Each structure stands twice: as C-alpha cells, then as structure tokens.
From Swiss-Prot:
GO terms for molecular function: DNA binding; N-methyltransferase activity; site-specific DNA-methyltransferase (cytosine-N4-specific) activity. This is Type II methyltransferase M.Cfr9I. It catalyses: a 2'-deoxycytidine in DNA + S-adenosyl-L-methionine = an N(4)-methyl-2'-deoxycytidine in DNA + S-adenosyl-L-homocysteine + H(+). One of its GO terms (biological process) is methylation. The gene is cfr9IM.
C-alpha cells in the first residue's frame, strides 16, 4: 500500500481499483459505492446507516452518481445491487438502517429553473412518470425499496417514522404538507445484535420503555454544505442499538460525514464511501483528526 502523506493529519492515498481494501481504524474512501464495497472484507462491519441519493431530485454532475436513472425500476435495482454487496460486508448479526425520501410524479416535466442561491437545487430533475402511475401520484419509493430489499433476502424488521417538527413549508394547497420520512431497519439474519436498553425511552409515569417507532427529530442545516444532511440525533439510536464500542459502522453514501461524527462521539469506528470529491472535502473538514484516513480510489 502506498505511503501516507504527512502534509495533513488526514492521510490521502491513491489505490488502484484492483487492490483489495483493508480496514485499520476509521476510514473514508472516495469512490463509487459498489466498486469500493466489492473490495472490502466480508463480515467486517457491524452496522450500516445510510441515506442514498433520492431518485430524480438533483444532478450533482458526477459520473456514476445514483438518482438520475431513467426509470424508477432502474434506480431501485441499482440500490438493491449495492445493498446486496453491503450485506456481504456486514457481520451475520449486523443491521442495516436506510433512510430515503419520497416524491411525486411530475407529469414528465424536465429540469427545474436555475436557482442562483443554491446551485445544487438548480439541477433538480423531474423524471418521467413511472409506468402504472399517474401525474401527481405519490411514488412510494421508500416502501418500494424496502420490499425490494426484503425480496433480496434482507429481514425487514421495523419502519421508523422520522417526524420533522420543523419541516419546511410547501406551496401545495391540495394535500397536507409533508413532514416525515421513513427509516427502515433491516437485518442480515433472523437473529442479530440489538441493545434495546441503549436506546430506551423514559415513560411519562416514570421508568423506561422500549423505544417507539415515531422519532421526533428536527432537521438541522450544515453551514458547509448546500444539501440536506442527516441529523445526528436520527443516526445516534441506530448506532447505539446495533453496535458496541469499537465496532465498525458503514455509510456507503457518506455525504458530509454525519455518521462519522456520531461514531467519533460514541467510540465507534466508521467506514465512509463518497463519490463526490467536494463532499469528501466537507467530511474531511468535519472529521479532522488523526483517526481518519482518506483514501482516494484511482480511476485506473
């Protein structure tokens, strides 16, 4: 493996795509999720917490990006393939937590008008109405993905409603304003590690109870990014319930690195994979410390 650069507390290494990857502490890989996953050791992470790019939301201008597939079926199939490889990397008693948003059919409209204040939003796209749906239909992406993963062999164990008390208003007047997303808990095996006491809730009458499936978590903007980020308090229960200190947590769509932030706070190791080099830089700035390696996957 190439020697580490010493100009930064974060090491930057160039690897060829054919080389197998080893985990040695918290690591951030810059590269395509599926390509990196295929080179990670089997059974090496205890938990996966992630939020894939939403379908048809925006174009990040990056080759191999997810979310711009021409059909919903292609999008879902691609995610199933990625999570199938992630399952191999997961321990037999490991868990997968997936947050993904929904959307409405567009009536086959094209790109949105440019937005000078938010370039990422300027490239938001409206894919064609999926076959079998009508204009203005709620697409149902979260549940379609959950059922597709279940069909692929995952155990679908829980659907958590992420309720957003500070949800952004919408201009629509012919339906309620959306204020929630889904977070699915899936497992690789019938029996798995889950520490319910680590995430128990206080009862109004005193004492504690098992955590319920509606989580009230405010969205929080991150100043360094022009896109939505995972709230730390949405991620924390997933990690605490599914891992022990020192375990590895994987996020194959690392974004700004919030999973890594929570892992640092909770004494877990993390493995992040992020395709967009701008987001890698954002994550690096958030995670500055000698415990993090940044490995940039060479194109060759």
């Amino acid at each position: 493996m190439p020697s580490k650069k010493s100009s930064s507390p974060l090491s930057v290494e160039k690897l060829h795509r054919s080389e197998p990857l080893e985990l040695n502490g918290a690591t951030l890989f810059e590269g395509d999720a599926l390509s990196v996953l295929r080179r990670l050791p089997s059974g090496s992470v205890r938990c996966i917490v992630t939020s894939p790019p939403y379908w048809g939301l925006r174009d990040y201008g990056i080759d191999e990006q997810i979310g711009l597939e021409s059909s919903m079926t292609q999008f879902l199939n691609r995610l199933v393939t990625i999570f199938s490889e992630a399952k191999r990397v997961l321990t037999d008693d490991g868990t997968l937590w997936v947050n993904i948003g929904d959307g409405y059919t567009s009536g086959n409209r094209g790109y949105r008008a440019p937005d000078k204040k938010n370039p990422a939003r300027a490239m938001a796209v409206r894919p064609d109405t999926p076959e079998g749906l009508k204009p203005k239909d709620l697409i149902g992406i979260p549940w379609r993905l959950a059922f597709a993963l279940q069909e692929d062999g995952w155990y679908l164990r829980s659907d958590i409603v992420w309720n957003k008390p500070n949800a952004m208003p919408e201009s629509v007047k012919d339906r309620p304003t959306r204020s929630h997303e889904f977070l699915f808990m899936l497992t690789k095996s019938e029996k798995y590690y889950y520490d319910w006491e680590a995430v128990r809730e206080e009862k109004d009458s005193g004492g504690f109870r098992n955590r319920r499936t509606v989580w009230n978590v405010n969205t929080k903007p991150f100043a360094g990014a022009h896109f939505a980020t995972f709230p730390t308090e949405l991620i924390r229960p997933c990690i605490l319930a599914s891992t022990k200190p020192g375990d590895y947590v994987l996020d194959p769509f690392f974004g700004s690195g919030t999973v890594g932030v929570v892992c640092q706070q909770e004494d877990r190791q993390y493995v992040g994979i992020e395709l967009n080099p701008e987001y890698v830089d954002i994550a690096v700035n958030r995670l500055q410390g000698e415990d993090t390696n940044v490995i940039r996957i060479a194109a060759a």
